[in-house]
Regions:
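Enrichment for repetitive, rod-forming helical segments
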Residues: 9, 15, 36, 49-51
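Helix-centric, low-specificity signal for extended rod-like, repetitive segments
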Residues: 1, 22, 35-37, 45
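Short, mixed-charge low-complexity intrinsically disordered segments
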Residues: 38-80
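A short, exposed loop/beta-hairpin motif centered on an aromatic-Gly-Thr core
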Residues: 17-33
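Extended low-polarity, hydrophobic cluster-rich segments
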Residues: 4, 25-26, 69-71
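Generic "edge-of-domain/loop-turn" microfeature
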Residues: 11-15, 32, 80
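Short aromatic-glycine-(Arg/Gly/Cys) micro-motifs in beta-strand/loop hairpins
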Residues: 1-21
Length: 80
Protein backbone atom coordinates (compact mmCIF):
# COMPACT_ATOMS: atom_id res chain seq x y z
CA UNK A 1 0.00 0.00 0.00
CA UNK A 2 1.25 3.48 -0.85
CA UNK A 3 1.29 6.26 1.70
CA UNK A 4 3.17 9.49 2.29
CA UNK A 5 5.64 10.25 5.02
CA UNK A 6 7.01 13.56 6.22
CA UNK A 7 10.73 13.38 6.95
CA UNK A 8 12.76 15.82 9.03
CA UNK A 9 16.41 16.18 7.99
CA UNK A 10 18.97 18.05 10.09
CA UNK A 11 22.60 18.05 11.15
CA UNK A 12 23.14 16.41 14.55
CA UNK A 13 26.03 18.03 16.38
CA UNK A 14 25.94 15.20 18.93
CA UNK A 15 26.26 12.47 16.28
CA UNK A 16 28.32 14.69 13.95
CA UNK A 17 26.26 13.70 10.90
CA UNK A 18 23.14 14.48 8.91
CA UNK A 19 20.08 12.71 10.29
CA UNK A 20 16.90 11.94 8.33
CA UNK A 21 14.05 10.71 10.48
CA UNK A 22 10.36 10.04 9.89
CA UNK A 23 8.30 12.82 11.40
CA UNK A 24 4.71 12.14 10.37
CA UNK A 25 2.83 9.61 8.20
CA UNK A 26 -0.46 9.93 6.32
CA UNK A 27 -2.20 8.00 3.61
CA UNK A 28 -3.12 11.16 1.71
CA UNK A 29 -0.48 13.55 0.42
CA UNK A 30 -2.86 16.50 0.71
CA UNK A 31 -2.97 16.05 4.50
CA UNK A 32 0.81 16.44 4.74
CA UNK A 33 0.81 19.41 2.37
CA UNK A 34 -1.79 21.02 4.68
CA UNK A 35 0.49 20.28 7.64
CA UNK A 36 3.36 22.11 5.89
CA UNK A 37 0.99 24.98 5.02
CA UNK A 38 -0.01 25.31 8.68
CA UNK A 39 3.64 25.15 9.76
CA UNK A 40 4.55 27.88 7.27
CA UNK A 41 1.79 30.10 8.67
CA UNK A 42 3.04 29.50 12.23
CA UNK A 43 6.67 30.25 11.31
CA UNK A 44 5.61 33.46 9.58
CA UNK A 45 3.71 34.61 12.70
CA UNK A 46 6.68 33.76 14.95
CA UNK A 47 9.08 35.62 12.61
CA UNK A 48 11.25 32.51 12.08
CA UNK A 49 13.44 32.30 8.97
CA UNK A 50 12.06 29.73 6.55
CA UNK A 51 11.72 29.03 2.84
CA UNK A 52 8.95 27.06 1.18
CA UNK A 53 10.80 25.35 -1.65
CA UNK A 54 7.66 23.77 -3.17
CA UNK A 55 4.43 22.20 -1.92
CA UNK A 56 6.34 19.16 -0.57
CA UNK A 57 9.44 20.81 0.95
CA UNK A 58 9.86 23.37 3.74
CA UNK A 59 13.23 24.62 5.02
CA UNK A 60 13.53 26.22 8.48
CA UNK A 61 16.53 28.15 9.82
CA UNK A 62 16.65 28.80 13.57
CA UNK A 63 19.27 29.82 16.11
CA UNK A 64 18.99 28.55 19.68
CA UNK A 65 21.52 29.58 22.35
CA UNK A 66 24.07 30.41 19.67
CA UNK A 67 23.63 27.08 17.86
CA UNK A 68 22.31 27.21 14.30
CA UNK A 69 19.57 24.68 13.63
CA UNK A 70 18.53 24.00 10.04
CA UNK A 71 15.63 21.66 9.38
CA UNK A 72 14.30 20.44 6.05
CA UNK A 73 10.86 18.84 5.99
CA UNK A 74 10.07 16.78 2.89
CA UNK A 75 7.08 14.69 1.87
CA UNK A 76 7.97 11.39 0.21
CA UNK A 77 5.89 8.50 -1.09
CA UNK A 78 6.55 5.22 0.76
CA UNK A 79 5.24 1.68 0.65
CA UNK A 80 3.75 0.41 3.89
Amino acid sequence: MKAFKLFKTYYSYIENKVVKEPFWAEVLKKDLVKLLDDTETKLKKENVSYMRVNDTTLYEHTEYNGVILDFTFTIEEVTI
